[in-house]
């Protein structure tokens, strides 16, 4: 049975036929970066949204432009209430963009052209629909109970700057399920 690639698979060493060399830690200084929003870049099948496969189809063009590194903002499974930064599942790709296999294929194709890929991977918060947050809400003493910051006192850390003052009144939001306030640094839906 074929296994589905996982996000951690990208951290494994190169195949044995490619001798490992310590990468130049300053490679980025002379690189041409290109930020690409998957949704807006190239729609290969007329659905109205770009895909990882569409991005892969255009790698030769990006290489021709002189791009050395693609910077891809979040493309993970998300309810998209914060531009994809509110990740529901770090191990899945947003279905409209493709699959994990599509991402693996993109990485392989980019590397064959000497193009690096970096991604935004916001691990300091999740979507409020993430399984960890839902478990934290319903089982304070469970495995995920302390994955988030909860309090009975919304004045705790009162001096902390509110980043989005136009939309958020506090860094704390009341949760009627747990009957406590949860801490968030951005919007209340990516917690």
Locate predicted features:
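Acidic/aromatic-lined carbohydrate-recognition and catalytic surfaces
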Residues: 2-191
